[in-house]
């Protein structure tokens, strides 16, 4: 059996950060996720999904996400219930996030009403490689050796 959820959407309000009596951080937020189809009026509708994240990722979400921020959530669906102050049984379905990705630059959420954005950061916990634009001038590369072969003794290599 599998219980896996991957969502991309925008926060409807700033994350709510709290701490348990044991000191564990927990943040809750609602993610507005557009549906892939349009309604009869040709408009896209959204689902508003409650998300919970724990410990250090909760603190990061509270510090770096705010209303309108685009975020990716990877986690699982959880259902729970409790008795409210009136004695009624309340059922809750939420996503417990195992990871939260910040999908736009920190200062970009102010203009979040526009869906036209350039994703400048690509984060993945499973990808150990990163790419960046390097200065390709020969002056900055001390190992360029002006195109000549490098004489290295195989005994000097650590592998």
Swiss-Prot record:
Domain SSB: start-end pairs: 2-104
Chain residue ranges for the region called Disordered: 106-159
InterPro entries with a match to the protein in the record: NA-bd_OB-fold (IPR012340), Primosome_PriB/ssb (IPR000424), ssDNA-bd (IPR011344)
Low complexity bias locations: 114-127
Pfam assignment, any one: SSB
GO BP term (any one): DNA replication
Gene3D superfamilies: Nucleic acid-binding proteins (2.40.50.140)
Keywords, sorted A to Z: DNA-binding
GO CC annotation, single: nucleoid
Subunit field text: Homotetramer.
Cited PANTHER family: SINGLE-STRANDED DNA-BINDING PROTEIN
Protein name: Single-stranded DNA-binding protein 2
Phylogenetic lineage: Bacteria, Bacillati, Bacillota, Bacilli, Bacillales
């Amino acid at each position: 059996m599998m219980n896996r959820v991957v969502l991309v959407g925008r926060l409807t309000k700033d994350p709510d950060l709290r701490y348990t009596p044991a000191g564990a951080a927990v943040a809750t937020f609602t993610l507005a996720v557009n549906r892939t189809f349009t309604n009869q009026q040709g408009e896209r509708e959204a689902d508003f999904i409650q998300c919970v994240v724990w410990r250090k990722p909760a603190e990061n979400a509270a510090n770096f996400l705010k209303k309108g921020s685009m975020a990716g959530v990877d986690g699982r669906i959880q259902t729970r219930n409790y008795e409210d102050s009136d004695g009624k049984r309340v059922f809750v379905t939420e996503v417990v996030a195992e990871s939260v990705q910040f999908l736009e630059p920190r200062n970009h959420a102010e203009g979040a009403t526009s869906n036209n954005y350039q994703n400048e950061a690509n984060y993945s916990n499973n990808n150990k490689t990163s790419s960046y634009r390097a200065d390709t001038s020969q002056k900055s590369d001390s190992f360029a050796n002006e195109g000549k072969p490098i004489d290295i003794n195989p005994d000097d290599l650590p592998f």
